[in-house]
From Swiss-Prot:
GO biological process, one term: methylation
Catalytic activity: a 2'-deoxycytidine in DNA + S-adenosyl-L-methionine = a 5-methyl-2'-deoxycytidine in DNA + S-adenosyl-L-homocysteine + H(+)
Protein name per UniProt: Type II methyltransferase M1.ScrFI
All copies of domain HTH cro/C1-type, residue ranges: 16-71
Organism lineage string: Bacteria, Bacillati, Bacillota, Bacilli, Lactobacillales
Organism from which the protein derives: Lactococcus lactis subsp. cremoris
Gene Ontology terms, MF aspect: DNA (cytosine-5-)-methyltransferase activity; DNA binding
Transmembrane segments: none
Keyword hit for Transcription: yes
């Protein structure tokens, strides 16, 4: 890195700092976002202090970093949606891709997810949904949301709406009851069906039926719709029997039956900071040997360009990356990069990642398989478009 004259250095340091502040990013977040090596935040701090000067390539990377949200609402969109437990907006993105749906309300509590959401959609989600009166939520055609898997009270034998109080699913149910959206899409882990000996899933379905919605469910893997990931989730779609005439016409999308390949999401050149250390690699190998000896199936998993798909990307991936490690020739394996994690969930290349690598892994691990959402959204819109009510 070269030392520069005071005037030029001052101009560049001011430009970098002003850009970073406009983006509402820390030095660490900006360094990770533009693909700098380990300790990139220290480098940016030196640039901002005028101690050293970035190369033309580095300046260009910072200047090119987008400041305008790429997925703002389309003004011509016909249908309105709300996005609950929104995360970074993966479900909203799937509906946005239909070009027929715009968001009028969203809710999320994680400050880092909110930052990513705002950078991409241009609007900031409201906070804690439990503190928002359902009457204050705008009218909408479609409600979407993912919610944590929680056991319900078993006070009543019916297992319906009243039994859901005190859970985050209740927040969804009370909004559906008050606002009567034409349709909804809920996403959850596949274990929802067996959680609490099946009572949780039964209570959810009973509650939605009680609210007079026609309900459809399906299990899909991310690779069913073109992603090289084995992530399996349950999808619950509902239509208001009172306002949709053809609610029984809905059919879940058909899986593509296409072979996937991990190489399709991998970058050709990856910074060494993603290669795991000797200490971590030794630990992974030791634990795998111990687990095998004790009859446990847990441990790291290696993948390469030709692997058909990876394990499920989880929110804990930032810790050690053991569930998805990429083989490297004559080197320790590496973790996937945040951009590769985004691709593994089907996020487009222009999706902005304005947070640190650690937060990015959490966010994509907590998000949804966007192509699956898009496929279901198109099928839902077919029904809404043909409804005669």
């Amino acid at each position: 890195m070269t030392t520069i004259s005071r005037n030029t250095g001052t101009e560049i340091s001011i430009m970098i700092k002003e850009k970073r502040l406009r983006l509402n990013m820390t030095q660490k977040e900006l360094a990770d976002a533009v693909g700098m090596s380990k300790n990139g935040d220290r480098t940016i701090r030196r640039w901002e202090n005028g101690e050293t000067c970035p190369s033309q390539l580095e300046i260009s990377a910072i200047l090119r970093f987008p400041e305008i949200a790429p997925f703002e609402n389309r003004k011509t969109a016909k249908y309105k949606m709300i996005d609950l437990f929104a995360g970074i907006g993966g479900t909203r993105l799937g509906f946005h891709q239909t070009e027929k749906v715009k968001s009028v309300f969203s809710s999320e509590i994680d400050k880092f997810a909110i930052k990513t959401y705002k950078a991409n959609f241009g609007d900031e989600p409201h906070g804690d949904i439990t503190k928002i009166d359902e009457k204050d939520i705008p009218d909408h055609d479609i409600l979407v949301g993912g919610f944590p898997c929680q056991a319900f009270s078993q006070a009543g034998k019916k297992l319906g709406f009243d039994d859901t109080r005190g859970t985050l699913f209740f927040e969804i149910a009370r909004i559906i009851k008050e606002k009567r959206p034409k349709a909804f899409l809920l996403e959850n882990v596949k274990n929802l069906k067996t959680h609490d000996k099946g009572r949780t899933f039964k209570t959810i379905l009973n509650t939605l039926e009680e609210l007079d919605y026609e309900v459809h469910t399906a299990l899909f893997k991310a690779r069913d719709f073109g992603l090289p990931q084995n992530r399996e989730r349950i999808y619950i779609v509902g239509f208001d029997r009172k306002s949709i005439s053809n609610y029984s016409d809905f059919q879940m999308p058909t899986p593509l039956q296409e072979k996937t390949r991990v190489g399709n999401i991998l970058e050709s050149v990856v910074d060494d900071k993603y290669t795991i250390s000797d200490k971590l690699w030794d630990g992974h190998q030791r634990r795998k040997t111990e687990n095998k000896k004790n009859g446990k199936g847990f441990g790291y998993t290696l993948f390469n360009q030709d692997s058909e798909y990876t394990n499920t990307l989880s929110a804990r991936y930032y810790k050690d990356g053991s569930e998805i490690l990429i083989e490297q020739k004559n080197k320790n394996p590496r973790k996937i990069t945040p951009r590769e994690a985004a691709r593994l969930q089907g996020f487009p290349e222009n999706f902005i990642i304005p947070v640190s690598d650690t937060q990015a892994y959490k966010e994509f691990g907590n998000s949804v398989a966007v192509p699956t959402i898009h496929a279901i959204a198109e099928k839902m819109l077919e029904v809404l478009e043909k409804s005669k009510k």
